[in-house]
Each structure stands twice: as C-alpha cells, then as structure tokens.
C-alpha cells in the first residue's frame, strides 16, 4: 500500500556529540532540603562517594576564589574540574603500587591514623571475577569489642559504590578486616536484602575467608613478630570465634592461636608445644586465667 506522512521537515541544529539531561529539583519541604543538590561541594562529595572509580571523567564547572595578579584582592573564577579518580587503586598492578600509596589509601578511606599492619590485594578470575583490597589494622578500633562496631567490606560493582558495610563478605571471626570488593558480575541494583541470597556473593565471601586465613598462616610462619602484634590486638576474636561456633571452627582456627609458655617465656603455638614434649609426657599442662600475672601466682 501507499505510505504517507504529515511530518514537516525542519532545520536541526546539531551541536556537540552527547546527550543533555536536565534535572528539576522539587521545592524544599520541612523534612527535605533539595537545594543542597545545587551546592557544588555537595555534588563533588556525592561523585567521590558513588562514582569516583567509573571509567569516564565526570567534569563540573566549579567556582573557586583566586588571588588576582599583582593584587591582594581575590576574585571568583570558574574552573573545569574532573571530580573522579577514574582508575581505582585496586585495579592497578600491585607491583606498581608503593607501600605509601596503600597506607595513604587505607587511612583516608577508613579514617585510621595508623598504617595498616597487613595489606591483602588480590584479583580473582573465574565463574565469579572480582578485585579485593583488604587491610588488617595495626590497632583495634576503640569500639571494636562493643556493640557499636560494624563489620563488613565496602562493595563496588564495576567501580560504582554500592554499599559501605556488606557484612556478608567477611565472617564473624575475621570481623577486624577492613577493605573493599569490586566485581563486574554483581548487579548495580543489589540491595542488602538480596545480599543474603546472592549466590555469587557467597562464592566471593568464601574465597575471601580462605584468602585471609592463608595470609594469617603465612604471617605466623614467616613473620612472627608481626603476627604477635596482630594477635595482641585480635587474638581474642579468634578464640571467641571457636567458642561462639560451639567448636565448629576449631579445626580451622586452632593453628592460628598462640599460648604463653612459662618454660620458653614467649608465645608459641599448640603444635610447637607438642613438638617439644618429652616422649614420656602424655598430657598437655596448662593454666587459665585473666592475666599472666594472676596465672603465675597460682
């Protein structure tokens, strides 16, 4: 059949490539101040929080105060500023990252004054691929053994921030670990409710637990002084992990525990104690108490 159209042709001014999206804010209410989304520093902080590591530059005209040339007066100047970092630290080759870069990132990201005791940077590819950048703090936070402390890792999907404390990513006995996970395989729309049932997240969590366990075992074996520092801060957490699981985690965690030897006057593992037992000794001798001083008086 015949085809006809009533549309009249007209000139079209084609500008630069791209799409213009205009957002209109609601009027302020007693409960919400929508004007804050017009504040350049608030917008900058939102971009840093949620989109700091997307692959493309997010640029905004920002008004800054600058000193006039040959004058003590200041003037407002509009500058084109890229707000996001684009390349996240955890996506870079770890051989090219300095200890200082890791330390600065940790202190800035997790509000700690101290350098981390241990950095665990891994990239895993397989059925579920992800990057993980984990830190063991050098000191237990002030609120660590209180109900106020929240465990969990920051969660990113394709460099976009999803949530701050994904508790499902780290087991209770390793709750001291801070850090983040970024996976290309997770949905950007994943919610806290969905986390508990997400199969891919369960795979990531299992691999992270094994990685932390392996790193602690290596530290115990190859850097005893550093491990002693770790155990002084978080050894109680490992003991509680065994106790709280009614012994189910005993096989997994027992080799990470240290005990003070009155004979050797230092901390040793159970395996080290057994190895040095005389052949005719059939029992393990121990005393328990709140402090070494109190035990010594028994």
Describe the predicted segments one by one.
Residues 1-298:
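Conserved GHKL (Bergerat-fold) ATPase module
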């Amino acid at each position: 059949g015949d085809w006809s159209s009533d549309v009249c042709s007209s000139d079209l001014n084609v500008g630069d490539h791209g799409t213009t999206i205009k957002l209109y804010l609601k009027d302020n209410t007693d409960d919400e101040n929508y004007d804050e989304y017009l504040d350049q520093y608030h917008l900058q902080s939102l971009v840093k929080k949620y989109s700091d590591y997307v692959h493309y530059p997010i640029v905004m005209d920002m008004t800054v105060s600058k000193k006039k040339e040959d004058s003590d007066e200041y003037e407002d100047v509009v500058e084109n500023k890229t707000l996001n970092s684009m390349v996240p630290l955890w996506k870079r080759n770890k051989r090219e990252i300095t200890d200082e870069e890791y330390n600065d990132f940790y202190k800035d990201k997790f509000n700690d004054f101290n350098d981390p005791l241990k950095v665990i940077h891994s990239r895993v590819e397989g059925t579920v691929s992800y990057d993980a950048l984990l830190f063991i703090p050098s000191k237990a936070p002030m609120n660590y053994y209180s109900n106020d402390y929240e465990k969990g890792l920051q969660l990113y999907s394709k460099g976009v921030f999803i949530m701050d404390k994904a508790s499902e990513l780290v087991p209770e006995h390793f709750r001291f670990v801070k850090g983040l996970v970024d996976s290309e395989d997770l949905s950007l729309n994943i919610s806290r409710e969905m986390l508990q049932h997400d199969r891919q997240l369960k795979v990531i969590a299992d691999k992270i637990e094994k990685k932390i366990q392996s790193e602690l075992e290596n530290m115990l074996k190859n850097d005893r002084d550093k491990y002693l520092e770790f155990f002084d801060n978080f050894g109680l957490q490992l003991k509680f992990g065994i106790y709280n699981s009614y012994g189910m985690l005993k096989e997994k965690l027992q080799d990470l525990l240290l005990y003070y030897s009155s004979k050797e006057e230092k901390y040793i593992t159970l395996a080290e104690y057994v190895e040095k037992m005389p052949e005719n000794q059939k029992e393990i001798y121990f005393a328990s108490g709140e402090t070494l001083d109190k035990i010594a008086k028994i």
